[in-house]
Each structure stands twice: as C-alpha cells, then as structure tokens.
Amino acid sequence: MELEQLKKSVEENPDDSSLQFELGLYLWDNGGDSEKAAEHFVLSAKSDPNNAVAFKYLGHYYSRVTLDLNRAAKCYQRAVLINPNDSDSGEALCDLFDRQGKEILEIAVCRDASEKSPKAFWAFCRLGYIQLHQKKWSEAVQSLQHAIRGYPTMSDLWEALGLAYQRLGMFTAAIKAYGRAIELDETKIFALVESANIFLMLGSYRKGVELFEQALKISPQNISVLYGLASGLLSWSKECINLGAFGWAASLLEDARKAAKASSELASSMSCIWKLHGDIQLTYARCFPWSGGTENSEFTLKTFSDSILSWRSICYSAALSAKASYQRALHLAPWQANVYTDIAITCDLVSSLSDDSDTSSSWKLPEKMVLGALLLECENSEFWVALGCMSDNSALKLHALIRALHLDVSLAVAWAFMGQIFRESDEMKFAKQAFDCARSIDPTLALPWAGSADTYARESTSDEAFESCLRAAQISPLAEFQVGLAWLALLQGNISSPQIFACIEQAVQRSPYYPEPHNLHGLVCEARHNYHTAIASYRLALAAMSIYPESSVKSHAGKVSINLVRSLSKAGRFKESVMECANLKSKGLLDAGGLQIYAFSLWRTGQNDSALSVIRDLAGRISTREKTSIAFPISFICSLLYCISGLDSAITSIQKMPKDFFQSSKISFIVSAIHSLDQSDRLQSIVASTRSYITSQEEIVAMHYLIALSKLLKTGAGDFLGYEKGIAHLSKAIHMYPHSNLIRNLLGYILLAGEGMKDACTASRCCIINVSECANKEGLKSALEVLGGGSVACNVIGNTAPRFSFPTCHCQYLNAPVVVVELQRFLHQEPSNSSVRYLLILNLVQKAREQRFPRQLCRAIERLISVALSDETCSKEGEYKKFQLLLCASEISLQMGNIAESINHARKASSLSLPSSYLFLGHLQLCRAYAANGSTKNMQEEYRACLELKTDSNIGWICLKLIESQYNLEPDANLLEMSLQECSSQKKNSWKEWMAVYSLARGLDSTGKKDFFSAEEFLAQACSLLNSESCLLLCHGAVCMELARQSNDSQFLSLAVKSLSKVQASSLFPLPIVYTLLAQAHGSLGSKEKWEKNLRLEWFCWPPEMRPAEVYFQMHILARQSEDRPETTSGIENYQSPEKWVIRAIHTDPSCRRYWKVLDKLVQHPMS
C-alpha cells in the first residue's frame, strides 16, 4: 500500500525532488529494483542538485551494483562537497581511493572536508590514520584529538592517539590514551602491550606486568605478550635484587621462566627469546636465596650441609640452563657478539658453583668465549673489560683493561677494575686514583665506592670508609660489600642499626657457605637483644667453618665460640653456656673475657664455689695484662664478689687490691656503687682517690647520677628512700650541667616518685623531650616516660588548653608539650615499644575521664589495651603494668555500661601475683563494679577483702570510705581512720595534704546526706590544713551559703565571703561559679555595688563555648538594673537589651520554664 501511495504521489508531482527520493529509497531498502531506485535518485538529484543524500545513494549504486567506480567516486565527491559532515559518503569515497592506491586524493578529500566543516569528524579520523601511517606524529595527534571530539567512545581512535604520543616521547599522555582505549574495549591487545612496554621503560614494572598478564588472558598464545611478560618480570626481579628482596625476586623469576619457556615453544627459531630465557636463568642462579637459616629449630651439622648442597644444586642447574639457552641463541644468530660474553659469564658462574677447575688448557672456556666476541667486534671496549674480568693472568687482565681505556677513556667500569688490580697488588696510591676516576665518571657504580672504603679503612678514617661502603651496598647488594659494611659498623659501634641488620640478613642468604656472614649476623642480633637468633647464627658459623676448605678461616673458631657463650649467657641459657665454656677451657681457648662469662654463668646456675674458683683464675691473669685492659676484669670481679659473697666480702677484697688497679674511671664507678650500699663508709678513701680519674663531662655527669642514688639509699629511713638529699644533690648538679638530659630525667623521676603532691609539676619542668633519645638504655628513664608518668599523676601537665574542666593546679600554666601527642608520635616510630604504649593508655584514660568518657575515645583505649595485654611479659614490672592495664580496661567497660566485662577485668587484676597493697585496688574496683550492678552481697565481700588486704595508698582508703558511706556498708570507722592516719604519717611531707583530702571526702559525703553542719565542720578542718587550696575553699564557701539560706544566719554569710574571697586570691586565673556565690553573699549582706561587680566578673570567668544559660540570665538582671540608672552604661550587660539576654539563655537551655516566664513578662510589659 505504501509503494502504491508513493507511486501515485510521484505521478501527481513528478517534479517533487523529495517524493522521487523517498520512492527510490523505499525501493532500495525493501529489496526492489535497484535500477528503478537509481532512476528515481537521478530524477531527485536533477530536481534538487543540492540533495547530498541522493548523490550518496547513487554512489552506493555505482560502487556496489554496476561497479562503476569512477561514477561512484564522482557521486560521493558531490555528496561530500554538498555536506562535508556526511561520514558515510566520505568513508565510502576514501575506501574507493584506498583500494585504487590514490592516497593523495584521499588526503585531499579529507583535508577539504575538514577545512570546510569542523564537525567533519570522519575526515579528521581518516586523516589521522593516514598521517599515523606516514609517521607524521605531530599532525596525527592534532587530527586524532579533533576526531575524538566527535567519536569519544571509539577505542581505535584512542589507541591510534596513544601510538602517536608514544612515538613523540610523550609517555604519560600515551599511557592515558591507551588506558582510555582499554576502558572502552578490554580486548585491545595492542593498547595493553604498548602501555605495558611504556611502564617497563619508565620503571613501573609492577604495572607493566599487570597489563601483560591482562593481555595474556585475552590472547594466551601471543608471542609478543609472553615475551613482554617475561622481560617485565625479569626487570622487576632486578629491582627487587637491588633492594635485597632475593626471595621475592626468585619467585618473580620463576614466573618469568615459565613465560619465556612458553614463548620459546611457540617460536623456537627466534634467538632473542632464547637469550631472554638465558638472562632469566642466569639472574635466578645469582639471586636464589638460601633459606635454611636461624628459624630452623632442628639444627645439626648434617642438616646445614644438606641445605647448602641443595641451595648449590638449584643455583647450578639454573646456571646450566642459562648456558644452554645462550648456546641455542648463538646457534640461531652467530653474529651476535654479546651472546659470547653472556656464555662466558655463565661458564664462570658454573665453574664457581661446581668447584671444578679446568687445568687441561692454558685458556679457560670463559676467556675463549670473550675472545670470540672480540673477533666479531674488536673495537668494543666492554668486551675487553669482560676479558680482563674473566682472565686469571694478571698481565692479560691489565692489558685488556688498558685496551678498553684506549678505546673509551671514560669507561668507568674499566677504571674500577683497574683500581681493584692495583689494590690487590698493594699499590694503594694508584688504586685510589683509579677508583676516584671511576666515581667521577659514574657515581652509580658500586665497585669504586667499595674500593674507596677499603682505602679509607687502611688510612683509619672510619667514617668515610663506612659511608663509602654503605653507598656501595646500597647500589649493589653484593655479599662482599655487605660483610665489609658490617665489619666497619662493628668498629664504629653502630652494628645494631636497621641498615646493618638488613644488609647482613641478605649476605647470609647469598653466602651461606661462608662463616663470616653468620658470625656477623650473630653480632648484629646480639646487639639488637635478639639472643636466641644470635645463638643460632653463631652455631651456623661454626658449622660453616667445619665444611669450609680454608684452614685460615677455621682458626677463628675460638672467637666465634666466645661469641656463642656470651649470647647463651645473655639469653639466660646458663647451663648451655657453662658446658660450652668448659669445652673451650679444655681446649685452651678461653681468654679473660670467656672466663668472665664462665664465672657469671656458674654463679647463675648456683655453682658459687666453682664461680669463685674461676674468679681466682681470672685474677691470676690480671697481673700479666696491660694496665689499660685490666679495668673491665677488675670491675667484673668486684661486682660478682658482691653478688656471691655479699657486701663485706667485696669491700674486703677491694681493700686488699693494689692501688694501681684503681687508676681507671670504670673501676671508680664500680667502687662508688659498692660504697653507696655501705652505711659504714669503709671505702671512702678509695672512692675519693679514684674520682680524680673521672675527667670527661659524660663521666662526671654519670658520677653525679650515682652519687644521687647513693644519697637516696643512705639517707633514707627504714623502707623509705631519702628523697630530700637526692633531690638536693641533683638540683646542684643540674645548675652545673643544665644540658644533661641524664640528670634532668633522674631528677624528674625522683620528684615524680616523691611524696609531695606538687612534685609532679616540678618534675615536668625538668624534662626536655627529644624523640631521638627516647630509646634509652635499660634501667634509665627517658624524658617522655617521666612526662608521661607526670601527666598521669596530674592531668593538667601537658594539657595547656583544657576544654572540659577548670583545673586549679598551677601546672596548667607551664608551656609544656601535649604529652599524648608526643607519646603517639614515638609509638608510631617504634610500634613494639610496650612502655610507651602503656603510658599512652594511662594518659588517654585520664583524657577520657576529663571528657566524661566519650564512647569513641573509650573504644580506641579498649583497642590499645587489647594490643598491650597480648604482649605478655614475665617480669615483676610487667605484672604491675598488666595489673594497671586490667584496671583501666575495667574502668572503661564500667563507664561504657558493660558491667560484666568490667567485673571480669577486675577479677583478673585481683588474681595476679602482686603485693597486697596493689591487690587492694583491684578489690576496690570490684566494689565499684558490683555497686553499679546492684549486687550488694558481692560488694560487701569485696569491701571486707579491702579491709583485710590494706594498702599504703591514701587515695585507696578515701575511695573505700566514700563507697562505705554511699552504700551504707558495715562501717568500721576506727579501722579506716587508723589506717589512713598510719598511711599518711609514713609520708611526713604530705600527711597534711592527705588528711585535708580525707576531710574533703567526708564533707562531700555529709553534703550528699544533707547534713550541712557536719559538712561545714569537715570542710573547715580541711581548709585549716590546706588554707590555700581553691577546691577546699570553694566547697566550704558553697556549704556556708547553703547554711546561711537555711538558718538565716549572717555569720555563715561572712564565713562564705571569707572563703570565697580566698579562692580568687589563691588562683592565678579566676574560677567560675565563685563570683556568683560571692554576689549572692554580698547581695544578702546588702551590698548592691559588690553584688553587681561580682556578677559582671562571673561573665569573664567562663570561656565563650562553655558559658551556661544562667550566666546570660544574670546579664539580663544587670541590664534591667542599668536601664533604671542611665549613668551606668559601661558594663558588659549594656551591649544587649534584657530581652536578648533572656533569649540567649533560652537558646542555651530551652527546657528552663523560668526563662520563658521572664521573657513573656518582658514582651508583655517592656520597659521604657
């Protein structure tokens, strides 16, 4: 029907171009007569010569039906001329020209269309492809960028643009273009491969390998992908080798080997694939790590030997495989000279791993292979260097390197090997010059740095030697460089550093058959206090000596054995240490140092008589030693005699020693330490004579440290230390040496442990935090630990801007750092430091208490406590820390409402093996938890347990008294009073303070019971003991105000005014609420002026973010008073009207009806 209608319309209007075209299009699309359709297209074009679509379909007719390509081209050209945006006509025309080889016409059509219309995106696209084919990269980029605006989702365009960028060297832009192409079409192999190659070239090996693996999933049999993947994994493994990650490198090389093997099966005639496979196998043989190390618990000589043989076998088979692959590559491409040198290097490695020496010929196989390379490229300087390295003939070696320098005088590697030859010949001057030349040419070459390190070491410039060797080891992690670096670090006393530990770990992996790396690894682990690993390393060193062929190395077995017994002793394995020492003594290998370890181990195993016998043997050897080396043995003898025989025996032995023995600062310290324990001062004269040998400032400071400890011990009474004398001595010493952190930290620590409540604030002023010095020696307290402990004792220390409380302690005015921040910073640097984590937890608990235990902070504390409790320690100090952590966990759980968990933590704390004085606090926490749970029976049991255990903690008794009063437990007031007075009397300097706190607690308890007369008596008693404490005076003033309200007695108002006035006089900064109470008191006494003054002062006591609603309401009262007196306009209350003050009070506390009523009155009856 539609065809009939179209024909009828054409018959009626034969000159209508659109009707002719529609009829022709219908016939074309519906399989009608194409010739008839073409006739109608011709008629349409004649009627409307600008109908581009008609010319397009005529072009289709001539190109597809009649195959008249010339007519088709003319029709398409006409269509494009009329409408340059017609992509179908343009593409069809370009395809015709392309098939005919008319590339110039194709370019002309595209240029003409692109110039006529910027939306002719097909033309830009086609032009970009042609320019890419013609390698006109810059022009192609412009055309493709324009085409992408029209076809932003066409992946081929992005891929072509990426190629153009890549050829221009714009690699970042190329990666982005390829990436967009891959996003649009994940199967774009070319984009994946080329972007991966770019990543490899830029050193991003991981990303390159990931892209190759993605391409491999799409095309598993693609040779380019397999080759690229293998080369990427090889490059990535070399990066890992340079970082010392040999195990990771070996696993990467195993994957690379599989990829290279697969590509060789697909294209076995390509020499580059076999060369790549050889490179992979050679690198694998060089980097495969030995894994039978210190973690092997079942160590025997056989297992060690088997592990070495297994490791050698793996490396040897990889080297043989590399040799075979290189030979196959050489067979396929015998003109490749560099393959000869690869075979030479591989043969040399095979020879070193097999221990076979070819003596049948004067020329070794590696030398012959290098000569083969030189026959092909005799002017290649690198081949001459290779010949110099492979040859054992010194003359030929020197000749080859000189020849290489003749060809290229700036060849750094030739200068480096030349320097090595001179060093081996002991020509150190020439060696130094050669190494300097190599370094100046190429600073990234490792050998010149290592050679310079050897030169500096011979010249006794250890710092330069260490830095040079460190540089060499960083550039190339060879075992020889790393071992040398460890020796230099040992000489400098820096062997425990992380750099040395990493280097020696890597050296052990690559040279397990050599004893020296194992011995150095043991020394490093020992310096890092990892004694069990050190023991295993020393035993591995001894095992390596037993299988090592050179006798010169075996002669050092005695030194390694001494290292072993020392580590056994430090690890607490004294029985094994005694056995090893006895074995060494029977062989005559036990020197003075070994005898000291032997005696110490015997004493620790309870064999005191044998230990004394060894000490006598050691003392007999002292007379034959030089005076400079007798200080340490004598100090050891004195210390061990004190431990075995006691103080009197040690003093007697010291008095019998010749005076020449005391001419050392080390002995002076030991004698002074023993003297500090002697109340009779029998060593006074000897101590005085030895002090003259303490000359350096460091030693003088340390002696002051020891003298202060001596005064603590000697001037104390009973079980209490003499804090006053120790503090006095340190106070003098700190004036002489104000920059000594040792004295500062000790003074702070003693003040912190003292009796005075304000000593914590003084202690915080002594310490200066230096994070680099926080990792102190064992037994010494760091400044961070002192400040951390001080901020636990007094929450204000380090909290320079309290936002949740109004502390009255003067510590708040110290410009101290925020302790929590410093603790977090140091814990971030050393996550394994349990002491810092412990202090951080305690400080965070204090912070949570100040902020009323916010849930987010409580959860963070719970996580920290969980980590800390998982770090089990067996020492008494560790038990006490665990006790504190469990109490903190219990408190946090209690505040978060998890009562059962709180009780569980408190029970665990109460079951620890600690003195009863500490366990008292655990049962006190159980009392609080059961009280919160409503379990009265259990609370009474824990209350009685506290009474039985007792404590020397004043605050413990006070808290128990509060619990007793609040929950009406069975009172035993006499026992509590007596215990508290006894506890306070032992602390002479602070008994008044504690009794005042106790009176405060009783006063608060009476206030809670509405017994204000008793409360006033208790608080007055507290104020008489501490008449300058703001908290006590404030409480007393508030209670007096309540009594005055109840009894209408002006005497209580006077007492309130007196106490509250003292509060502000004793506070450096005004406290809130005090002025309000004073205003009430003065108002009741009839002083309106003082009433107004104090209300105004109350406004300034509050920080803006903490002002309560009542303060705004007070301002409304003053504002109304000011309206009655226009002359008073200078007050803060006049800044706003009374209505606005009330509105601000309502905004702060909208639940107060009183404010709403006042506002209603003000609105209804505004004042004039």
Curated annotation (Swiss-Prot):
GO terms for biological process: nuclear-transcribed mRNA catabolic process, 3'-5' exonucleolytic nonsense-mediated decay; positive regulation of wax biosynthetic process; post-transcriptional gene silencing. SUPFAM superfamilies: TPR-like. Component of the cytoplasmic SKI complex, which consists of SKI2, SKI3 and VIP3/SKI8. It holds the Pfam family TPR_2. InterPro entries: Ski3/TTC37, TPR-like_helical_dom_sf, TPR_2, TPR_rpt. This is Tetratricopeptide repeat protein SKI3. One of its GO terms (cellular component) is Ski complex. Signal peptide: none annotated.
